[in-house]
């Protein structure tokens, strides 16, 4: 007796929903958060997969831009300042995260045109 019931087939190895969808973000955890968050009475099977994919895409986009900002500043480690520069210099991400404050992010370098010294070019 192998304890496998009547079928006698060996049980296949469990495969996570994240690996089935080809994602790094945890589909099961997103599903749990959707259920516990009281967003709706019921949550479909595809909803957490789609949401995990969207979150993974946005994270990858921000990390790529922040990595470029870190490389521009000759740094090998991404700090909150690099995240701030990445988000605020990208038009779409800036619109999406318009009301978000990034701690230790600072501000974009910007000098108003009226504060710059006057151009006194002599053309004679």
From Swiss-Prot:
Post-translational modification: Monoubiquitination of Lys-119 gives a specific tag for epigenetic transcriptional repression. Phosphorylation of Ser-2 directly represses transcription.
Region (Disordered): 1-21
Locations listed in the record: Nucleus; Chromosome
Segment forming the signal sequence: none
An annotated Gene Ontology molecular function: DNA binding
Keywords: Acetylation, Chromosome, DNA-binding, Isopeptide bond, Methylation, Nucleosome core, Nucleus, Phosphoprotein, Ubl conjugation
Residue ranges, compositional bias (Basic residues): 1-18
Keyword Acetylation (UniProt): yes
Location of Phosphoserine modifications: 2
PTM annotation (N-acetylserine): residues: 2
PROSITE patterns assigned: HISTONE_H2A
InterPro entries reported in the protein's UniProt record: Histone-fold, Histone_H2A, Histone_H2A/H2B/H3, Histone_H2A_C, Histone_H2A_CS
Pfam families (UniProt xref): Histone, Histone_H2A_C
GO cellular component, one term: nucleus
Glycyl lysine isopeptide (Lys-Gly) (interchain with G-Cter in ubiquitin) crosslink location in chain: 119
PANTHER family listed in its UniProt record: HISTONE H2A
Quaternary data: The nucleosome is a histone octamer containing two molecules each of H2A, H2B, H3 and H4 assembled in one H3-H4 heterotetramer and two H2A-H2B heterodimers. The octamer wraps approximately 147 bp of DNA.
Protein name (database record): Histone H2A
Organism: Paracentrotus lividus
Lineage, highest ranks first: Eukaryota, Metazoa, Echinodermata, Eleutherozoa, Echinozoa
């Amino acid at each position: 007796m192998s304890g496998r019931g009547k079928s006698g087939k060996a049980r296949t190895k469990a495969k996570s929903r994240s690996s089935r969808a080809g994602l790094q973000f945890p589909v099961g955890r997103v599903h749990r958060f959707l259920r516990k968050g009281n967003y709706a009475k019921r949550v479909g099977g595809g909803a957490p997969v789609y949401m995990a994919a969207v979150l993974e895409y946005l994270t990858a986009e921000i990390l790529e831009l922040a990595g470029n900002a870190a490389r521009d500043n000759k740094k090998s480690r991404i700090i909150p300042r690099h995240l701030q520069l990445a988000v605020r210099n990208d038009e779409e991400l800036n619109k999406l995260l318009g009301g978000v404050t990034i701690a230790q992010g600072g501000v974009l370098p910007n000098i108003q045109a009226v504060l710059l010294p006057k151009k006194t070019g002599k053309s004679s």
